[in-house]
UniProtKB/Swiss-Prot annotation:
Heme 1 (or BL or b562) is low-potential and absorbs at about 562 nm, and heme 2 (or BH or b566) is high-potential and absorbs at about 566 nm. This is Cytochrome b. Component of the ubiquinol-cytochrome c reductase complex (complex III or cytochrome b-c1 complex) that is part of the mitochondrial respiratory chain. The b-c1 complex mediates electron transfer from ubiquinol to cytochrome c. Contributes to the generation of a proton gradient across the mitochondrial membrane that is then used for ATP synthesis. It comes from Artibeus fimbriatus (Fringed fruit-eating bat). Belongs to the cytochrome b family. The cytochrome bc1 complex contains 11 subunits: 3 respiratory subunits (MT-CYB, CYC1 and UQCRFS1), 2 core proteins (UQCRC1 and UQCRC2) and 6 low-molecular weight proteins (UQCRH/QCR6, UQCRB/QCR7, UQCRQ/QCR8, UQCR10/QCR9, UQCR11/QCR10 and a cleavage product of UQCRFS1). This cytochrome bc1 complex then forms a dimer.
Length: 379
């Protein structure tokens, strides 16, 4: 008799995705981050659901409702800190996942890659709106500054900003709609994840060598299920350590002060995972130019497949490209650091230099280096 997992209409979909799925035998730990992102999404939806049961999206009570969750709700502090730090773990895994794709040439699966970029934008939007909900100082001023960027759009900018705000400033209407969208978006993200996996399973996984692995495949279960479980344990241990020992490490102290539209914080900045893009935004003195650079800093990923000039897919055997890749990583760390610093000398010039380098490496240096490597292959 045929196994039920191969005949049942629902189980056979799960079977072909997670059990009998043929996978390359050479996948390294860098291929763990997809499943880790799935766990992060699950943790965020669960903790968020329970937080939403106690949260009130009203400017008069939002801050107090968060305080109530932390002080009066059973294990409310744990839910709150798991959700806040879970977002940080989510972005750590996201950036490592994208970095893996860039290093090993996974962007050549263009459908999967483009859905991934959409996912990145959706998760960033979700995180931004979530940061506004506690209605602390940085929530309010962060929302004001970032939404105000849309006013740089010619002709419709001002109307668009007021439409998003629901008035002439960030107020009750803004908070209510941000809560509604923050609740809705993770489910849209979940749907996009399914599409992402659908396209991935059409082509099969890439592997570290970048060459087709059709002759050497192994079943996903038990090999990669066990490997993923180890990844879960490592990540959840890291998250638990962060939450239980240093829960405010990645947060901003200003957000423990209730929002006050009469007092501007000395330095308005977003959460750490947006600082690289924020630094690029600030490095351009023109408002519209800054907004375009901000959007392009992420959207540039969409043209990476077009810029692939190498005869080899992966960077595994391309030492010159490897050097450039790690230079790009160093530039991103520099931008993240600069984004958290005040706008003064020498941070301004460092930020501008790093921003130019970021675009220069991706748009020119990497394709040119690939052509040089192609030439060296002839020797």
């Amino acid at each position: 008799m045929t196994n039920i997992r191969k005949t049942h209409p629902l189980l056979k979909i799960i079977n072909s995705s997670f059990v009998d799925l043929p996978a390359p035998s050479s996948l390294s730990s860098w291929w763990n981050f997809g499943s880790l992102l799935g766990i992060c999404l699950g943790v965020q939806i669960l903790t968020g659901l329970f937080l939403a049961m106690h949260y009130t999206s009203d400017t008069a009570t939002a801050f107090n409702s968060v305080t109530h969750i932390c002080r009066d709700v059973n294990y409310g502090w744990l839910l709150w800190y798991l959700h806040a730090n879970g977002a940080s773990m989510f972005f750590i895994c996201l950036y490592l996942h994208v970095g893996r794709g860039l290093y090993y040439g996974s962007y050549m699966y263009s459908e999967t890659w483009n859905i991934g970029i959409l996912l990145l934008f959706a998760v960033m939007a979700t995180a931004f709106m979530g940061y506004v909900l506690p209605w602390g100082q940085m929530s309010f001023w962060g929302a004001t500054v970032i939404t105000n960027l849309l006013s740089a759009i010619p002709y419709i900018g001002t109307d668009l900003v007021q439409w998003i705000w629901g008035g002439f400033s960030v107020d009750k209407a803004t908070l209510t709609r941000f809560f509604a969208f923050h609740f809705l978006l993770p489910f849209i993200v979940t749907a996009l994840v399914m599409v992402h996996l659908l396209f991935l399973h059409e082509t099969g996984s890439n592997n570290p060598t970048g060459i087709p692995s059709d002759p050497d495949m192994i079943p996903f279960h038990p090999y990669y299920t066990i490997k993923d479980i180890l990844g879960f344990l490592v990540m959840l241990t890291a998250l638990a350590t962060l939450v239980l020992f240093s829960p405010d490490l990645l947060g901003d102290p200003d957000n423990y002060i209730p929002a006050n539209l009469l007092i501007t914080p000395p330095h308005i900045k977003p959460e750490w995972y947006f600082l690289f893009a924020y630094a690029i935004l600030r490095s351009i003195p023109n408002k519209l130019g800054g907004v375009l650079a901000l959007v392009m800093s992420i959207l540039i990923l969409a043209i990476v497949p077009v810029l692939h000039m190498s005869k080899q897919r992966s960077m595994m055997f391309r030492p010159l490209s490897q050097c450039l890749f790690w230079l790009l990583v160093a530039v991103l760390f520099t931008l993240t650091w600069i984004g958290g610093q005040p706008v003064e000398h020498p941070y301004i010039i460092i930020g501008q230099t790093a921003s130019v380098l970021y675009f220069l490496i991706i748009l020119f240096l990497m394709p040119m280096t690939s052509l040089v490597e192609n030439y060296l292959l002839k020797w």
